[in-house]
Curated annotation (Swiss-Prot):
Family affiliation: Belongs to the peptidase S1 family.
Protein name as annotated: Cationic trypsin-3
Residues holding Ca(2+): E76, N78, V81, E86
Organism per entry: Rattus norvegicus (Rat)
Location within or outside the cell: Secreted, Extracellular space
Gene coding for it: Try3
Cleaved propeptide residues: 16-24
Length: 247
């Protein structure tokens, strides 16, 4: 899901909730198998969003990815085949941020507690929460099983990766006048061609080994002047830690 008219990052839509599709990577490359052991697939009989494992029993995703029942699939690369080493664990608790706004996508973050702890190994491991916020120009890695086409649909079986920079607040806000809150940032390329897309929603943006972003929304995918918009995880570290401790 991408959101925002298709905003396509996570599947909802900020201005016009037009499409509840999830996002996928456009213009990226197939990730090295099991090289992103923190990446999870959220499954409801089908892949619908991504997420990030932050400890053995908790996953960070996007609030717009909420479903009442979710199975978290860890250790995945080809989501259409059981390759061996995957772990499928049902969600015990699904907690959206209390201030999430489905119209604006502000506070688009959600925590999922696994029914039982994941077994951590070379294929399934955690990503660190940010120690500080990312800065403009920082190179990051976005990943997911979302749509790979900016026009049309092609959902990949294999996890896709995209290397992309954090954009300045000014260029982000000028791309989406009046829609970027202090809890959002843009990442990608103003010239278009590379972006997250439907199906990538909820998935990770990792910069220097830290989870800085969650795929949230955008206007279409990989459109010129319309970069992807991401939830700024650094603003939620306290909420995440407090929620995990209380549940």
């Amino acid at each position: 899901m991408k959101a925002l008219i298709f905003l396509a990052f996570l599947g909802a839509a900020v201005a016009l909730p037009l499409d509840d599709d999830d996002d996928k990577i456009v213009g990226g490359y197939t990730c090295q198998k099991n090289s992103l052991p923190y990446q999870v697939s959220l499954n409801a009989g089908y892949h619908f969003c991504g997420g990030s494992l932050i400890n053995s029993q908790w996953v960070v995703s996007a609030a717009h990815c909420y479903k009442s029942r979710i199975q978290v699939r860890l250790g995945e690369h080809n989501i259409d085949v059981v390759e061996g080493g995957e772990q499928f664990i049902d969600a015990a608790k699904i907690i959206r941020h209390p201030s999430y706004n489905a119209n604006t996508f502000d506070n688009d973050i959600m925590l999922i507690k696994l029914n039982s702890p994941a077994t951590l190994n070379s294929r399934v491991s955690t990503v660190s929460l940010p120690r500080s916020c990312g800065s403009s120009g920082t190179k990051c890695l976005v990943s997911g099983w979302g749509n790979t086409l900016s026009s049309g649909t092609n959902y990949p079986s294999l996890l896709q990766c995209l290397d992309a920079p954090v954009l300045s607040d000014s260029s982000c806000k000028s791309s989406y006048p009046g829609k970027i809150t202090s809890n959002m940032f843009c990442l990608g390329f103003l010239e278009g061609g590379k972006d997250s897309c439907q199906g990538d929603s909820g998935g990770p943006v990792v910069c220097n080994g830290q989870l800085q972003g969650v795929v949230s929304w955008g206007y279409g995918c990989a459109q010129k002047g319309k970069p992807g918009v991401y939830t700024k995880v650094c603003n939620y570290v306290n909420w995440i830690q407090q929620t995990v401790a209380a549940n």
